[in-house]
Amino acid sequence: MSDHKLAGKVAVVTGGGSGIGRAICLLFGQEGARLAVLDVDADAGEDTAARVRAAGGVAECFPCDVSAQGQVESVFAALQERLGALDIAVNNAGIAHVGTVETTSEADLDRVYAVNVKGVYNCLRSEVSAMKGRGGAILNLASVASSVGIPDRFAYSMSKGAVLTMTYSVACDYVAHGIRCNAIAPGRVHTPFVDGFLRRAYPGREAEMFQKLARTQPIGRMGEPEEIAALALFLCSDDARFITGSNLPIDGGFVSLKV
């Protein structure tokens, strides 16, 4: 049974159309939040919103390309007009890329930067503007790639390192405004994002690579989106009111136990 930890709160989740973002939306909806589901894929975002509503929650989809600052500003204005003043924000939207510094083209780097770095920056600007004077909780999705070297993930690692430092900066600059800003660093998590990534990067070898990735986790398996959502709920709820400027790993021991 839900404790309704987010009752009366308005929350926005970017990349809410699938995977971790969808799991966060579904759990936040169960906990009483009024949800704005943002996704560049309008159909996927609406599907998530419909699932939240079917479970008795309140949710609306707002199609949004987080890399476009003007679009982000318009969407944040619209969602607050529809749902109320913003209390919680989860910056989850992101893309992956395979490559070393030599094999990553400038176009590849620009594409990853636009979504994973500029996209978070764009959202953070609108979020802190909305929360100043009333407080709130912001959660950024970083990665184990923020902390350790991972083969063939140059652009992705760069982008997630930037997410982590943006988290620390926002936490420092806005703590006096009652705004908490934290990050979580997932390890390997089984999502449609991962399945699609494996199909594109390793055609014909998806099953082999899935098992290989799962074995990199000391705990012996990939994480599930619902496990990430549970940590997100804690950090965005009043249970975490004394936590800000933190990066919490949720990686099956990938960073601290890897040998």
Can you say where each PLM-predicted feature lies in the sequence?
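Short C-terminal tail/terminal secondary-structure segment
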Residues: 2, 148, 233, 244-259
